[in-house]
Swiss-Prot record:
Keywords: Acetylation, Membrane, Transmembrane, Transmembrane helix. Widely expressed. It is found in: Membrane. The modification N-acetylmethionine is found at M1. It is a multi-pass membrane protein. This is Transmembrane protein 243. The chain crosses the membrane at residues 32-52, 62-82, 94-114. InterPro entries: DUF2678. Belongs to the TMEM243 family. One of its GO terms (cellular component) is membrane.
Length: 118
C-alpha cells in the first residue's frame, strides 16, 4: 500500500495547496499589502476630490469620488464574502482585478484633480 505522504491526487506532483477557506502566510501578507496600499490611495483620492484645486469642490471631482466609493464598496462586499467562505477561491482573481481597476481609477482621478499634463 502506498504511503499517504506521497499521494499526488491526480496532480503532476505533491499537492500542498491549502484547503478551501485556509490561507497561507504568504497570501495573508500579499492581501495586507495590497489592501493597505489601495486603502491609502482611495483615502488620498477622496480627500483630493474635495480639497483640490480650490474650495468649493468641482461637481466632476465629487462625481469621481462617488464612483470610486461605490466601486470600493463593491470590492469590500466581495472581500467580506470571500473571507466568510461564501465564494470559491477562483473569485480571488476577480477581487484582484476589481482592486486593480479601482487603483487605475484613483490614479486617473488624481491626475485630473492636480491638473497633470495641462
Amino acid at each position: 500500500m502506498e504511503d499517504f505522504a506521497t499521494r499526488t491526487y491526480g496532480t503532476s506532483g505533491l499537492d500542498n495547496r491549502p484547503l478551501f477557506g485556509e490561507t497561507s502566510a504568504k497570501d495573508r501578507i500579499i492581501n495586507l499589502v495590497v489592501g493597505s496600499l489601495t486603502s491609502l490611495l482611495i483615502l488620498v483620492t477622496l480627500i483630493s476630490a474635495f480639497v483640490f484645486p480650490q474650495l468649493p469642490p468641482k461637481p466632476l471631482n465629487i462625481f469621481f469620488a462617488v464612483c470610486i466609493s461605490l466601486s470600493s464598496i463593491t470590492a469590500c462586499i466581495l472581500i467580506y464574502w470571500y473571507r466568510q467562505g461564501d465564494l470559491e477561491p477562483k473569485f480571488r482573481k476577480l477581487i484582484y482585478y476589481i482592486i486593480f481597476s479601482i487603483i487605475m481609477l484613483c490614479i486617473c482621478a488624481n491626475l485630473y484633480f492636480h491638473d497633470v499634463g495641462r
